[in-house]
């Protein structure tokens, strides 16, 4: 399916975006190995998260999926209750699922194969294979990409590991392995990354130690069931935050969005560019802060993106670059090499699409330079990346003509009702089939 957009006359209204994808992954995994029953409200029923649910079910976890209510009811099997699956576990398109499961499975008393779709089979896994091997895991792969064959070792040993880059997925993978390791596992990261795993471990009553740059867990503990309500995903909210910011006449409110400080890079950077964003009704539940976000149209200016904001914005850069494309002046992103190993090379995909829509964009090895201008209509390719697809749908709100985005089926991995909510607030996006032009 493709998306086709026409310019918007302005966004208005109040919507609630679906549950946070990162928290959904972690919540169901930890609930599955906890003792007792956990109800998960607000679970994201996207393809990536459902791949995680399926993998856990194949290992004996009892998970009732109430899809129309976004609820899971999980009967935990305890730390040692997982069973060997009868076949390879398919993680679909989800890098988070395969990396978290690798950490969980490294210390089990059985062997497992983890695989995924063609995109996932190109994503780098050396970053988890190397430290897991130091803990005593044995993992076979060809070229350090999936499929991964994990030979479970119940006698893992804790390590002190310095992450070469800020990565919540790698950090979480090692913390999960550390739950099954003898001794203490300590992870030090060069800059803060999202900390949902740490918060959820605390929510499930697991003891951990944390300071400014390091997090430590000791093996041999237990997780205790604890109901959880998942906030809206700020990565999904970001599409509407940018769309309302760049489209004249816009004013929208996004309800109950997760505002974890390790995820606020997109708001921090948009405010630096001049955005009118107000965060209100701040509350904290299940260890995670939430708030309502009100956004009004504003004129933006280009900026040099501070390096310390890059790890806090890594999933939101595709749509942030749309904001940069219509800002006055130049925006420069560096230290973003991680964008090249996402579902697609997001630097190359964004530069290609922006150039097709008339914007001066230059690719750097670890980032991009964008000279703000006027978005033209045209046709772009999402390269089967959900965030690229939705970012260019946002571009269509302000473009001078219709924009067609190719290959958008993958949006279902993270935001199944994106088109519905986009039209609800006035974005003018529709799904179309076939190869016809405008």
Swiss-Prot record:
<feature type="binding site">
    <location>
        <position position="123"/>
    </location>
    <ligand>
        <name>phosphoenolpyruvate</name>
    </ligand>
</feature>
<keyword id="KW-0028">Amino-acid biosynthesis</keyword>
<dbReference type="InterPro" id="IPR023193">
    <property type="entry name" value="EPSP_synthase_CS"/>
</dbReference>
<comment type="pathway">
    <text>Metabolic intermediate biosynthesis; chorismate biosynthesis; chorismate from D-erythrose 4-phosphate and phosphoenolpyruvate: step 6/7.</text>
</comment>
<dbReference type="InterPro" id="IPR036968">
    <property type="entry name" value="Enolpyruvate_Tfrase_sf"/>
</dbReference>
<dbReference type="GO" id="GO:0008652">
    <property type="term" value="P:amino acid biosynthetic process"/>
</dbReference>
<keyword id="KW-0963">Cytoplasm</keyword>
<protein>
    <recommendedName>
        <fullName>3-phosphoshikimate 1-carboxyvinyltransferase</fullName>
        <ecNumber>2.5.1.19</ecNumber>
    </recommendedName>
</protein>
<feature type="binding site">
    <location>
        <position position="169"/>
    </location>
    <ligand>
        <name>3-phosphoshikimate</name>
    </ligand>
</feature>
<comment type="similarity">
    <text>Belongs to the EPSP synthase family.</text>
</comment>
<feature type="binding site">
    <location>
        <position position="21"/>
    </location>
    <ligand>
        <name>3-phosphoshikimate</name>
    </ligand>
</feature>
<comment type="function">
    <text>Catalyzes the transfer of the enolpyruvyl moiety of phosphoenolpyruvate (PEP) to the 5-hydroxyl of shikimate-3-phosphate (S3P) to produce enolpyruvyl shikimate-3-phosphate and inorganic phosphate.</text>
</comment>
<feature type="binding site">
    <location>
        <position position="167"/>
    </location>
    <ligand>
        <name>3-phosphoshikimate</name>
    </ligand>
</feature>
<feature type="binding site">
    <location>
        <position position="21"/>
    </location>
    <ligand>
        <name>phosphoenolpyruvate</name>
    </ligand>
</feature>
<dbReference type="InterPro" id="IPR001986">
    <property type="entry name" value="Enolpyruvate_Tfrase_dom"/>
</dbReference>
<comment type="subunit">
    <text>Monomer.</text>
</comment>
<feature type="binding site">
    <location>
        <position position="387"/>
    </location>
    <ligand>
        <name>phosphoenolpyruvate</name>
    </ligand>
</feature>
<feature type="binding site">
    <location>
        <position position="22"/>
    </location>
    <ligand>
        <name>3-phosphoshikimate</name>
    </ligand>
</feature>
<feature type="binding site">
    <location>
        <position position="26"/>
    </location>
    <ligand>
        <name>3-phosphoshikimate</name>
    </ligand>
</feature>
<dbReference type="InterPro" id="IPR013792">
    <property type="entry name" value="RNA3'P_cycl/enolpyr_Trfase_a/b"/>
</dbReference>
<dbReference type="GO" id="GO:0009423">
    <property type="term" value="P:chorismate biosynthetic process"/>
</dbReference>
<feature type="active site" description="Proton acceptor">
    <location>
        <position position="315"/>
    </location>
</feature>
<keyword id="KW-0057">Aromatic amino acid biosynthesis</keyword>
<feature type="binding site">
    <location>
        <position position="315"/>
    </location>
    <ligand>
        <name>3-phosphoshikimate</name>
    </ligand>
</feature>
<keyword id="KW-0808">Transferase</keyword>
<dbReference type="Pfam" id="PF00275">
    <property type="entry name" value="EPSP_synthase"/>
</dbReference>
<dbReference type="GO" id="GO:0003866">
    <property type="term" value="F:3-phosphoshikimate 1-carboxyvinyltransferase activity"/>
</dbReference>
<feature type="binding site">
    <location>
        <position position="95"/>
    </location>
    <ligand>
        <name>phosphoenolpyruvate</name>
    </ligand>
</feature>
<dbReference type="GO" id="GO:0005737">
    <property type="term" value="C:cytoplasm"/>
</dbReference>
<feature type="binding site">
    <location>
        <position position="342"/>
    </location>
    <ligand>
        <name>3-phosphoshikimate</name>
    </ligand>
</feature>
<feature type="binding site">
    <location>
        <position position="346"/>
    </location>
    <ligand>
        <name>phosphoenolpyruvate</name>
    </ligand>
</feature>
<dbReference type="InterPro" id="IPR006264">
    <property type="entry name" value="EPSP_synthase"/>
</dbReference>
<feature type="binding site">
    <location>
        <position position="169"/>
    </location>
    <ligand>
        <name>phosphoenolpyruvate</name>
    </ligand>
</feature>
<dbReference type="GO" id="GO:0009073">
    <property type="term" value="P:aromatic amino acid family biosynthetic process"/>
</dbReference>
């Amino acid at each position: 399916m493709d998306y086709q957009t026409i310019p918007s006359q302005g966004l208005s209204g109040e919507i609630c975006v679906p549950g946070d994808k990162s928290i959904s992954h972690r919540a169901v995994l930890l609930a599955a190995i906890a003792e007792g029953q956990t109800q998960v409200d607000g679970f994201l029923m996207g393809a990536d998260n459902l791949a995680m649910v399926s993998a856990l079910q194949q290992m004996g976890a009892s998970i009732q999926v109430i899809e129309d209510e976004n609820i899971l009811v999980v009967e935990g099997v305890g730390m040692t209750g997982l069973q060997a699956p009868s076949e390879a576990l398919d993680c679909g398109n989800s890098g988070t699922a395969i990396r978290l499961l690798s950490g969980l499975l490294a210390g089990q008393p059985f062997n497992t194969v983890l695989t995924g779709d063609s995109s996932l089979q190109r994503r780098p896994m050396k970053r988890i294979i190397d430290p897991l091997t130091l803990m005593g895991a044995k993992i076979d792969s060809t070229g350090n990409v999936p499929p991964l064959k994990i030979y479970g070792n119940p006698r893992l040993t804790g390590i002190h590991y310095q992450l070469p880059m800020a990565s919540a997925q790698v950090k979480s993978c090692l913390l999960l392995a550390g739950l099954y390791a003898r001794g203490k596992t300590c992870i030090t990261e060069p800059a803060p990354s999202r900390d949902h795993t740490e918060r959820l471990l605390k929510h499930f009553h697991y003891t951990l130690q944390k300071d400014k740059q390091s997090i430590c867990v000791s093996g041999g503990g237990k997780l205790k069931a604890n109901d959880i309500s998942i906030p809206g995903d700020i990565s999904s909210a970001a599409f509407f935050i940018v769309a309302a910011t760049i489209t004249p006449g816009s004013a929208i409110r996004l309800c109950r969005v997760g505002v974890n400080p390790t995820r606020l890079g997109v708001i921090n950077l948009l405010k630096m560019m001049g955005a009118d964003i107000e965060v209100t009704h701040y509350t904290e539940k299940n260890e995670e802060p939430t708030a309502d976000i009100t956004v009004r149209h504003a004129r933006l200016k280009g900026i040099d993106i501070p390096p310390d904001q890059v790890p806090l914005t890594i999933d939101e850069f595709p749509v942030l670059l749309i904001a940069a494309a219509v800002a006055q002046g130049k925006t420069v992103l560096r230290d973003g090499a991680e964008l090249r190993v996402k579902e697609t090379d997001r630097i190359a995909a964004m530069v290609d699409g922006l150039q097709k829509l008339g914007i001066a964009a230059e690719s750097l090895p670890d980032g991009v330079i964008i000279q703000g201008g006027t978005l033209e209509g045209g046709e772009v390719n999402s390269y089967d990346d959900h965030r690229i697809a939705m970012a260019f749908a946002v571009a269509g709100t302000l473009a001078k003509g219709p924009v067609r985005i190719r290959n958008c089926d993958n949006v279902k991995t993270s935001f199944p009702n994106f088109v519905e909510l986009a039209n609800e607030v006035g974005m003018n996006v529709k799904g179309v089939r076939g190869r016809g032009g405008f």
